[in-house]
Amino acid sequence: MSVLRIDRRIVHILLVVCVFIAAWVADACVAMHTEHKVAQAVKANSRLENTPDVFIGGTPYVWAAASKEIPYLEVKALDVEVPKLGMVNASTVLRDITVTPEQVMNGDIEGAPVSTYSRGISLDGVALGRLLGITDLSISNPDDISPSGGTSAEAELTGTLPGDTHKSTAKVTLRLVGPEFRMQVYDTDDERLQKAFSLNFDTRQLPLPAQATAVKMQGGTISFEIQRRNIKVQLAQLSPLEIEGSEQKAVE
């Protein structure tokens, strides 16, 4: 009898585990379906050659049907060719999306209210080096300075200047002054380094829907971001890169 009771307990535990796994798999399938649908819709309405990666946060996903809110959605495109910049990484992030149960299940979030909308573009050493004319440029954090963001940040640049046979290093400030991005050397009086590692440009030339509102240095890249609050999602806004006909032109 004791053996039978133990067997029944094991059966009950296995049943609970099976139900849990089945529910988890079903929830994952619904989430993957929504991510796939959003990705395909973004690709169809943008100039992206490849399907972007889409991630929807919140577990379990179907709980959004009851809470009527998707807490996080990210659309990311990696290694996208952009005129003047070369390959860049770009992303669009939506936070606190108010949805109906139907939108949760079918993945169509067009017109859904969003608490925070942000879009960012990241330039790695290759892309920034292309603007500076330095083919082997690398970007890192200055010593004893943690990654930062906002309207100002700092970075350390290393690369071989044209005509040189050895690499040079300089620390730079990253500033947003109105629509303009200003990168200036601050740790040396060497005029050649100051000229080589300095850069100014209008952030409205970036493939963003408006001038950048934040700049940060993180993970070997310099990122520019715009952020808006309390908007209603339009399909064109989900593209990680600004496209013709949405809000402003991409890089000219």
Give the predicted meaning of each segment.
Residues 90-100, 170-179, 239-252:
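A short, surface-exposed beta-strand/turn
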Residues 58-60, 79-81, 96-98, 161, ...:
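A mature extracytoplasmic/lumenal domain signature
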